[in-house]
Amino acid sequence: MSHQMAPWIPMFIQSCKNNTEPFVSFQFATVDELTNKPRCRTVVFRDFLFHDKRTNVLTFNTDMRSSKITESFITPNSNNSSDSKRCETPFFEACFYFPETWEQYRFSGQCFTISKQFKKIPAEIVTKYDIFSPRFSETNDDSTDEEIDTPINDDDDDDKNNDADNNDINEDNKLIESIENDEHHEDEDDYYPQPQEWEAELLRQWSSLSRHTKSLYRKPAPGQKLTSETSKQLDKLHRGVDGAKEDAGLENFGIVCLCVDSVDFLNLKEGRGGERWIFQKTDGKDEDLWEEQEVCP
């Protein structure tokens, strides 16, 4: 079993650290499964999967009712029930640009989602990208702490007084603790994340959101027609009097995970008119390997 950090990760982390904006935003593009038309939107980088840069998996948060999910992550005319609904793994391209350092990263690969709605993570993408259980990564001292300040921890002061609402997910927190203390893993399949570990990651990222951000997942579905009723709902949310508990939006919350196959890095501030590197993932016998090639910018 190998769990190694890709060679482009340190460069990317440093670029994020050099960013002075409150968020690291980027463009995320997929192809609509039904129309075969390209779709692109701006999203916010949240963290590495399981808060471990060695997964080489980037994440951002999304509303599972949004068009990006129906366009790319759900098979057209699927009749799967909610309990057995399968997450698709579409190809993607993502582009980060850091204007202060004139650096650009273009990522391509496959992606999947973690949510209450998608109970099953496709095993083929987990094994293809060697996404190992966080139980193994937690034994290593390497982490993203103090290396990259992503907006995953965007709590506001009001959240500190949320004891009543937080009691609603105490059982979920116990789940996370039980996973961290679990040392039983004998089968090869145990190297990969178990269902409760995917759920724990969902709760970790959800719990790190501010009260305001959580409220966005209680809004009417994105793209829904604006009526007098939906206007009232939005107004109540804006004033904080909608009457719903803070975690009511968890059902609509999802994490999109970007599994990277290739990286095109361009640095226009570097001498000699800039520099450009291509990183390409290759499948080794026992571990994933990366080929690096400097090319003309």
Swiss-Prot record:
Give the stretches traversing the membrane: none
Q: What segments bear the compositional bias annotation Acidic residues?
A: 139-170
> One GO cellular component from the entry?
cytoplasm
Task: Mention one GO molecular function.
Answer: FMN binding
Give one Pfam family, short name only: Pyridox_oxase_2
* InterPro entries referenced in this protein's UniProt entry, alphabetically: Pyridox_Oxase_Alr4036_FMN-bd (IPR024624), Split_barrel_FMN-bd (IPR012349)
Q: Where is this region: Disordered?
A: 136-174
Q: Which domain of life is it from?
A: Eukaryota
Q: What does the record list as coiled-coil region(s)? A: none
What PANTHER family does this protein map onto?
AGL049CP, PYRIDOXAMINE 5'-PHOSPHATE OXIDASE ALR4036 FAMILY FMN-BINDING DOMAIN-CONTAINING PROTEIN
Miscellaneous = Present with 2840 molecules/cell in log phase SD medium.
What's this protein's family per the entry?
To S.pombe SpBC725.03.
Give the protein's recorded name. Uncharacterized protein YGR017W
Origin species, per record, is Saccharomyces cerevisiae (strain ATCC 204508 / S288c)
